Amino acid sequence: MRDVFIVAAKRTPLGRFGGSLTNFSAADLGAHVMKSVLAQAGVGGDQLDLYIMGNVLRAGHGQLIPRQAALKAEIPDTVDGYAVDMVCSSAMMSVINAALTIRAGEGDLILAGGTESMSQTGFYLSHRARWGYKFLMGAPENLTDLLLHDGLTDSTNGEGMGEQTEKLAAEHGFSRIELDEVACLSQQRAAHATESGYFDSEIAPIEITSRKGTQVLASDEGIRSDTTVESLGKLRSAFAKDGVLTAGNCSQITDGAAALLLASGEAVEKYQLKPLAKILGGSWAAGTPSRFPELPITASQKLLAKLDKTLADFDLFENNEAFSVSNLLFERRLGVDRDKLNVNGGAIALGHPIGASGARIMVTLLYALQQRDKTLGLAALCHGTGGGTAIALERV
Protein backbone atom coordinates (compact mmCIF):
# COMPACT_ATOMS: atom_id res chain seq x y z
CA MET A 1 0.00 0.00 0.00
CA ARG A 2 1.27 3.44 -0.93
CA ASP A 3 1.99 6.27 1.49
CA VAL A 4 -0.37 9.25 1.50
CA PHE A 5 0.99 12.72 2.24
CA ILE A 6 -0.73 15.99 3.12
CA VAL A 7 0.97 18.68 1.04
CA ALA A 8 -1.35 21.62 1.77
CA ALA A 9 -4.06 22.41 4.31
CA LYS A 10 -6.25 25.47 4.74
CA ARG A 11 -9.55 26.56 6.23
CA THR A 12 -11.70 29.64 6.11
CA PRO A 13 -12.20 31.76 9.17
CA LEU A 14 -15.39 30.48 10.78
CA GLY A 15 -18.32 32.88 10.60
CA ARG A 16 -21.04 33.23 13.19
CA PHE A 17 -24.57 32.18 12.26
CA GLY A 18 -26.00 35.16 10.39
CA GLY A 19 -22.59 36.83 10.58
CA SER A 20 -19.98 38.04 8.11
CA LEU A 21 -20.09 34.95 5.87
CA THR A 22 -23.89 34.84 5.54
CA ASN A 23 -23.82 35.89 1.89
CA PHE A 24 -21.28 33.21 0.95
CA SER A 25 -22.83 29.97 -0.25
CA ALA A 26 -21.35 26.58 0.55
CA ALA A 27 -20.00 26.56 -3.01
CA ASP A 28 -18.37 29.97 -2.48
CA LEU A 29 -16.71 28.86 0.75
CA GLY A 30 -15.60 25.59 -0.79
CA ALA A 31 -14.13 27.38 -3.79
CA HIS A 32 -12.15 29.64 -1.49
CA VAL A 33 -10.38 26.80 0.31
CA MET A 34 -9.90 24.84 -2.90
CA LYS A 35 -8.07 27.79 -4.43
CA SER A 36 -6.11 28.31 -1.24
CA VAL A 37 -4.75 24.77 -0.93
CA LEU A 38 -3.79 24.64 -4.60
CA ALA A 39 -1.97 27.96 -4.24
CA GLN A 40 -0.24 26.78 -1.07
CA ALA A 41 1.03 23.65 -2.82
CA GLY A 42 1.87 25.48 -6.02
CA VAL A 43 -0.07 23.13 -8.29
CA GLY A 44 -2.78 23.74 -10.85
CA GLY A 45 -6.29 22.38 -10.72
CA ASP A 46 -5.61 20.46 -13.92
CA GLN A 47 -3.15 18.27 -12.01
CA LEU A 48 -5.87 16.94 -9.70
CA ASP A 49 -7.22 13.45 -10.20
CA LEU A 50 -10.31 14.01 -8.06
CA TYR A 51 -11.89 16.20 -5.41
CA ILE A 52 -14.11 15.01 -2.54
CA MET A 53 -15.96 17.43 -0.28
CA GLY A 54 -18.26 16.89 2.66
CA ASN A 55 -21.55 18.78 2.73
CA VAL A 56 -24.76 18.18 4.67
CA LEU A 57 -27.22 21.05 4.29
CA ARG A 58 -27.52 21.07 0.50
CA ALA A 59 -31.29 21.16 -0.10
CA GLY A 60 -32.13 23.97 -2.51
CA HIS A 61 -28.51 24.75 -3.37
CA GLY A 62 -28.33 22.95 -6.70
CA GLN A 63 -26.64 19.87 -8.02
CA LEU A 64 -23.31 18.64 -6.64
CA ILE A 65 -22.02 21.50 -4.49
CA PRO A 66 -18.38 20.29 -4.66
CA ARG A 67 -18.44 20.59 -8.45
CA GLN A 68 -19.98 24.05 -8.21
CA ALA A 69 -17.14 24.97 -5.87
CA ALA A 70 -14.50 23.43 -8.11
CA LEU A 71 -15.67 25.35 -11.15
CA LYS A 72 -15.76 28.58 -9.11
CA ALA A 73 -12.18 27.76 -8.08
CA GLU A 74 -11.25 27.51 -11.78
CA ILE A 75 -10.51 23.81 -11.56
CA PRO A 76 -10.99 22.49 -15.12
CA ASP A 77 -14.31 20.85 -15.89
CA THR A 78 -12.41 17.73 -16.94
CA VAL A 79 -11.60 17.06 -13.26
CA ASP A 80 -14.51 15.40 -11.48
CA GLY A 81 -15.50 15.06 -7.85
CA TYR A 82 -18.24 14.07 -5.47
CA ALA A 83 -19.88 14.92 -2.16
CA VAL A 84 -19.94 12.96 1.08
CA ASP A 85 -22.80 13.25 3.58
CA MET A 86 -21.93 11.55 6.87
CA VAL A 87 -23.37 14.42 8.91
CA CYS A 88 -20.61 15.86 11.12
CA SER A 89 -18.08 13.26 9.91
CA SER A 90 -18.60 14.20 6.25
CA ALA A 91 -15.34 16.07 5.72
CA MET A 92 -13.20 13.59 7.63
CA MET A 93 -14.71 10.73 5.65
CA SER A 94 -13.91 12.68 2.49
CA VAL A 95 -10.25 12.73 3.53
CA ILE A 96 -10.33 9.05 4.46
CA ASN A 97 -11.85 8.21 1.06
CA ALA A 98 -9.20 10.29 -0.69
CA ALA A 99 -6.43 8.52 1.21
CA LEU A 100 -7.88 5.09 0.41
CA THR A 101 -8.12 6.03 -3.28
CA ILE A 102 -4.45 7.02 -3.36
CA ARG A 103 -3.38 3.93 -1.42
CA ALA A 104 -5.23 1.77 -3.94
CA GLY A 105 -3.38 3.42 -6.83
CA GLU A 106 -6.51 4.99 -8.31
CA GLY A 107 -5.23 8.55 -7.96
CA ASP A 108 -2.12 10.53 -7.08
CA LEU A 109 -3.32 14.03 -6.22
CA ILE A 110 -6.72 14.48 -4.56
CA LEU A 111 -8.26 17.50 -2.86
CA ALA A 112 -10.52 16.63 0.07
CA GLY A 113 -12.40 18.50 2.76
CA GLY A 114 -15.81 19.96 3.44
CA THR A 115 -17.94 23.08 3.19
CA GLU A 116 -21.10 24.32 4.88
CA SER A 117 -23.18 27.49 4.96
CA MET A 118 -25.51 26.97 7.88
CA SER A 119 -26.68 30.58 7.52
CA GLN A 120 -28.01 29.90 4.02
CA THR A 121 -29.98 26.82 5.01
CA GLY A 122 -33.63 27.31 4.13
CA PHE A 123 -37.07 25.91 4.89
CA TYR A 124 -39.22 23.49 2.94
CA LEU A 125 -42.76 22.40 2.25
CA SER A 126 -43.40 18.68 2.09
CA HIS A 127 -44.26 16.62 -1.00
CA ARG A 128 -47.91 17.44 -0.33
CA ALA A 129 -47.29 20.80 -2.01
CA ARG A 130 -46.35 19.08 -5.27
CA TRP A 131 -49.51 17.03 -5.54
CA GLY A 132 -51.93 19.62 -4.22
CA TYR A 133 -53.57 20.27 -0.90
CA LYS A 134 -57.00 18.64 -0.99
CA PHE A 135 -57.88 19.17 2.64
CA LEU A 136 -55.94 21.34 5.05
CA MET A 137 -58.58 21.41 7.76
CA GLY A 138 -56.98 19.98 10.88
CA ALA A 139 -53.74 19.24 9.01
CA PRO A 140 -51.99 22.54 8.30
CA GLU A 141 -48.84 22.52 6.22
CA ASN A 142 -45.98 24.07 8.16
CA LEU A 143 -42.59 25.22 6.97
CA THR A 144 -39.85 22.88 8.18
CA ASP A 145 -36.49 24.32 9.20
CA LEU A 146 -33.92 22.32 7.22
CA LEU A 147 -31.13 23.31 9.58
CA LEU A 148 -32.86 21.46 12.39
CA HIS A 149 -34.45 18.72 10.28
CA ASP A 150 -31.45 17.69 8.17
CA GLY A 151 -28.61 18.84 10.39
CA LEU A 152 -29.42 18.68 14.08
CA THR A 153 -32.19 16.09 14.51
CA ASP A 154 -31.84 12.31 14.75
CA SER A 155 -33.87 11.09 11.78
CA THR A 156 -34.39 7.67 13.37
CA ASN A 157 -36.57 8.97 16.19
CA GLY A 158 -37.06 12.72 15.74
CA GLU A 159 -35.05 13.64 18.84
CA GLY A 160 -32.77 16.64 18.78
CA MET A 161 -29.09 15.86 19.22
CA GLY A 162 -28.97 18.28 22.13
CA GLU A 163 -31.78 16.42 23.88
CA GLN A 164 -29.97 13.12 23.36
CA THR A 165 -26.72 14.53 24.72
CA GLU A 166 -28.53 15.95 27.75
CA LYS A 167 -29.71 12.42 28.61
CA LEU A 168 -26.21 11.03 28.08
CA ALA A 169 -24.71 13.69 30.35
CA ALA A 170 -27.14 12.69 33.09
CA GLU A 171 -26.32 9.01 32.61
CA HIS A 172 -22.60 9.71 33.00
CA GLY A 173 -23.14 12.04 35.93
CA PHE A 174 -21.53 15.07 34.29
CA SER A 175 -22.21 18.23 36.27
CA ARG A 176 -22.96 21.70 34.93
CA ILE A 177 -19.74 23.08 36.42
CA GLU A 178 -17.63 20.37 34.75
CA LEU A 179 -19.16 21.13 31.36
CA ASP A 180 -18.77 24.88 31.81
CA GLU A 181 -15.11 24.41 32.74
CA VAL A 182 -14.53 22.58 29.44
CA ALA A 183 -16.32 25.36 27.54
CA CYS A 184 -14.39 28.11 29.29
CA LEU A 185 -11.08 26.41 28.54
CA SER A 186 -12.06 26.13 24.87
CA GLN A 187 -12.74 29.87 24.70
CA GLN A 188 -9.54 30.75 26.55
CA ARG A 189 -7.39 28.52 24.36
CA ALA A 190 -8.97 29.79 21.14
CA ALA A 191 -8.54 33.41 22.23
CA HIS A 192 -4.90 32.78 23.13
CA ALA A 193 -4.27 30.99 19.83
CA THR A 194 -5.79 33.89 17.90
CA GLU A 195 -3.86 36.55 19.81
CA SER A 196 -0.63 34.57 19.43
CA GLY A 197 -1.07 34.11 15.68
CA TYR A 198 -1.32 30.33 15.92
CA PHE A 199 -4.20 30.23 13.43
CA ASP A 200 -2.51 32.48 10.87
CA SER A 201 -0.94 29.59 8.95
CA GLU A 202 -4.16 27.62 8.65
CA ILE A 203 -6.68 30.39 7.88
CA ALA A 204 -7.21 31.64 4.33
CA PRO A 205 -8.67 35.16 4.88
CA ILE A 206 -11.82 36.10 2.97
CA GLU A 207 -12.59 39.45 1.37
CA ILE A 208 -16.13 40.62 2.08
CA THR A 209 -17.53 43.30 -0.20
CA SER A 210 -20.54 45.37 0.82
CA ARG A 211 -21.92 48.85 0.30
CA LYS A 212 -19.52 49.99 3.01
CA GLY A 213 -16.55 48.77 1.00
CA THR A 214 -14.29 45.73 1.21
CA GLN A 215 -13.25 44.18 4.48
CA VAL A 216 -11.10 41.14 5.20
CA LEU A 217 -12.21 38.46 7.64
CA ALA A 218 -9.06 36.76 8.90
CA SER A 219 -10.12 35.34 12.26
CA ASP A 220 -12.95 33.28 13.71
CA GLU A 221 -16.02 35.26 14.73
CA GLY A 222 -17.36 33.11 17.55
CA ILE A 223 -14.53 33.41 20.06
CA ARG A 224 -15.49 35.14 23.30
CA SER A 225 -12.25 36.02 25.06
CA ASP A 226 -14.03 37.35 28.15
CA THR A 227 -15.74 34.04 28.92
CA THR A 228 -15.52 32.82 32.50
CA VAL A 229 -16.99 29.85 34.32
CA GLU A 230 -19.07 32.37 36.26
CA SER A 231 -20.52 33.97 33.13
CA LEU A 232 -21.30 30.55 31.66
CA GLY A 233 -23.04 29.62 34.89
CA LYS A 234 -25.60 32.38 34.34
CA LEU A 235 -26.89 30.86 31.09
CA ARG A 236 -30.14 28.94 31.17
CA SER A 237 -30.54 25.31 30.20
CA ALA A 238 -31.02 24.77 26.47
CA PHE A 239 -32.63 21.36 26.08
CA ALA A 240 -34.23 20.30 29.36
CA LYS A 241 -35.60 21.97 32.47
CA ASP A 242 -32.68 22.25 34.90
CA GLY A 243 -30.47 20.52 32.32
CA VAL A 244 -26.69 20.86 32.20
CA LEU A 245 -26.37 21.83 28.52
CA THR A 246 -26.53 25.51 27.57
CA ALA A 247 -25.70 27.67 24.57
CA GLY A 248 -22.33 28.26 26.22
CA ASN A 249 -21.15 24.66 26.56
CA CYS A 250 -22.35 23.43 23.15
CA SER A 251 -20.80 24.12 19.75
CA GLN A 252 -21.84 27.16 17.74
CA ILE A 253 -23.82 27.07 14.49
CA THR A 254 -21.28 28.32 11.98
CA ASP A 255 -20.33 28.89 8.34
CA GLY A 256 -17.01 27.70 6.96
CA ALA A 257 -14.94 25.32 4.85
CA ALA A 258 -11.67 23.42 5.11
CA ALA A 259 -9.61 21.36 2.70
CA LEU A 260 -6.42 19.34 2.44
CA LEU A 261 -4.43 18.34 -0.62
CA LEU A 262 -3.37 14.70 -0.52
CA ALA A 263 -0.58 13.25 -2.65
CA SER A 264 1.11 9.94 -3.31
CA GLY A 265 4.88 9.66 -3.05
CA GLU A 266 5.00 9.67 -6.84
CA ALA A 267 3.06 12.94 -7.00
CA VAL A 268 5.32 14.49 -4.36
CA GLU A 269 8.33 13.69 -6.51
CA LYS A 270 6.71 14.58 -9.85
CA TYR A 271 5.43 18.00 -8.77
CA GLN A 272 8.23 18.70 -6.28
CA LEU A 273 5.77 19.04 -3.41
CA LYS A 274 6.69 19.55 0.23
CA PRO A 275 4.89 17.09 2.52
CA LEU A 276 3.53 18.47 5.78
CA ALA A 277 2.36 15.16 7.20
CA LYS A 278 1.61 11.56 6.39
CA ILE A 279 -1.84 10.01 6.91
CA LEU A 280 -1.27 6.85 8.92
CA GLY A 281 -4.85 5.61 8.68
CA GLY A 282 -8.49 6.26 9.36
CA SER A 283 -11.38 4.40 10.92
CA TRP A 284 -15.10 4.62 11.58
CA ALA A 285 -17.56 3.13 14.03
CA ALA A 286 -21.31 3.05 14.61
CA GLY A 287 -23.67 2.28 17.45
CA THR A 288 -26.93 3.26 19.11
CA PRO A 289 -28.02 6.53 17.42
CA SER A 290 -28.68 8.40 20.66
CA ARG A 291 -25.20 7.56 21.96
CA PHE A 292 -23.40 9.30 19.12
CA PRO A 293 -21.03 11.34 21.37
CA GLU A 294 -19.42 8.07 22.52
CA LEU A 295 -18.67 6.75 19.03
CA PRO A 296 -15.42 8.71 18.40
CA ILE A 297 -14.01 6.66 21.28
CA THR A 298 -14.85 3.41 19.48
CA ALA A 299 -13.49 4.74 16.18
CA SER A 300 -10.27 5.82 17.90
CA GLN A 301 -9.86 2.45 19.61
CA LYS A 302 -10.30 0.67 16.27
CA LEU A 303 -7.73 2.96 14.69
CA LEU A 304 -5.20 2.46 17.49
CA ALA A 305 -5.56 -1.31 17.17
CA LYS A 306 -5.16 -1.15 13.40
CA LEU A 307 -2.01 0.96 13.71
CA ASP A 308 -0.68 -1.11 16.64
CA LYS A 309 -0.29 2.06 18.69
CA THR A 310 -1.42 3.32 22.09
CA LEU A 311 -2.63 6.71 23.30
CA ALA A 312 0.81 7.27 24.79
CA ASP A 313 2.32 7.28 21.29
CA PHE A 314 0.37 10.40 20.32
CA ASP A 315 1.41 13.94 21.14
CA LEU A 316 -1.82 15.83 20.43
CA PHE A 317 -5.51 15.06 19.96
CA GLU A 318 -8.52 16.81 18.44
CA ASN A 319 -12.03 15.68 19.29
CA ASN A 320 -14.77 17.83 17.86
CA GLU A 321 -16.50 19.75 20.63
CA ALA A 322 -20.05 19.23 19.46
CA PHE A 323 -20.80 19.46 23.18
CA SER A 324 -18.61 19.75 26.29
CA VAL A 325 -19.84 16.22 26.94
CA SER A 326 -17.76 15.11 23.94
CA ASN A 327 -14.53 16.22 25.61
CA LEU A 328 -15.34 14.70 28.99
CA LEU A 329 -16.11 11.38 27.33
CA PHE A 330 -12.86 11.49 25.37
CA GLU A 331 -10.92 12.24 28.53
CA ARG A 332 -12.62 9.81 30.90
CA ARG A 333 -13.68 6.92 28.67
CA LEU A 334 -10.73 6.92 26.28
CA GLY A 335 -8.13 8.34 28.66
CA VAL A 336 -6.85 11.37 26.74
CA ASP A 337 -5.00 13.98 28.80
CA ARG A 338 -6.78 17.36 28.75
CA ASP A 339 -3.43 19.09 28.22
CA LYS A 340 -3.12 17.30 24.86
CA LEU A 341 -6.73 17.71 23.70
CA ASN A 342 -7.94 20.61 21.52
CA VAL A 343 -4.94 22.68 22.55
CA ASN A 344 -6.02 25.69 20.47
CA GLY A 345 -9.67 25.51 21.46
CA GLY A 346 -12.50 23.66 19.79
CA ALA A 347 -15.93 24.00 18.26
CA ILE A 348 -17.45 25.54 21.39
CA ALA A 349 -15.29 28.60 20.74
CA LEU A 350 -14.60 28.35 17.01
CA GLY A 351 -17.86 26.90 15.72
CA HIS A 352 -19.07 23.74 14.02
CA PRO A 353 -19.96 24.02 10.30
CA ILE A 354 -21.18 20.45 10.25
CA GLY A 355 -20.14 19.39 6.75
CA ALA A 356 -16.66 20.92 7.17
CA SER A 357 -15.65 20.25 10.77
CA GLY A 358 -13.99 16.89 10.12
CA ALA A 359 -11.44 18.58 7.87
CA ARG A 360 -11.24 21.70 10.04
CA ILE A 361 -10.04 19.77 13.08
CA MET A 362 -7.46 17.97 10.91
CA VAL A 363 -6.11 21.28 9.62
CA THR A 364 -5.93 22.68 13.16
CA LEU A 365 -4.25 19.51 14.46
CA LEU A 366 -1.65 19.59 11.71
CA TYR A 367 -0.58 23.15 12.45
CA ALA A 368 -0.69 22.56 16.21
CA LEU A 369 1.83 19.75 15.72
CA GLN A 370 4.02 22.15 13.76
CA GLN A 371 3.78 24.91 16.36
CA ARG A 372 4.75 22.59 19.20
CA ASP A 373 7.31 20.60 17.21
CA LYS A 374 5.39 17.38 17.83
CA THR A 375 5.03 14.35 15.60
CA LEU A 376 1.88 12.25 16.02
CA GLY A 377 -1.70 13.48 16.16
CA LEU A 378 -5.14 11.87 16.24
CA ALA A 379 -8.40 13.59 15.29
CA ALA A 380 -11.91 12.25 15.87
CA LEU A 381 -15.52 13.36 15.81
CA CYS A 382 -19.03 12.04 16.25
CA HIS A 383 -21.90 12.25 13.80
CA GLY A 384 -25.66 12.21 14.04
CA THR A 385 -27.63 8.93 13.89
CA GLY A 386 -24.89 7.21 15.85
CA GLY A 387 -21.41 7.15 14.39
CA GLY A 388 -17.90 8.48 14.60
CA THR A 389 -14.66 8.68 12.65
CA ALA A 390 -10.98 8.98 13.53
CA ILE A 391 -7.78 9.65 11.62
CA ALA A 392 -4.09 9.66 12.55
CA LEU A 393 -1.38 11.99 11.22
CA GLU A 394 2.40 11.92 11.40
CA ARG A 395 4.17 15.22 10.80
CA VAL A 396 7.12 14.89 8.42
UniProtKB/Swiss-Prot annotation:
It catalyses: 2 acetyl-CoA = acetoacetyl-CoA + CoA. It is an enzyme of class 2 (transferase). Pathway: Biopolymer metabolism; poly-(R)-3-hydroxybutanoate biosynthesis. SUPFAM superfamilies: Thiolase-like. This is Acetyl-CoA acetyltransferase. Its EC number is 2.3.1.9. Nitrogen-free medium induces chlorosis in Synechocystis, leading to the degradation of the photosynthetic apparatus and concomitant accumulation of cytoplasmic polyhydroxyalkanoic acid (PHA) granules which in this cyanobacterium are composed of PHB. It comes from Synechocystis sp. (strain ATCC 27184 / PCC 6803 / Kazusa). PANTHER family: ACETYL-COA ACETYLTRANSFERASE, CYTOSOLIC (PTHR18919:SF107), ACETYL-COA C-ACYLTRANSFERASE (PTHR18919). The keyword Amino-acid biosynthesis does not apply. The active site is at 88 (acyl-thioester intermediate), 352 (proton acceptor), 382 (proton acceptor). Belongs to the thiolase-like superfamily. Thiolase family. Homotetramer.
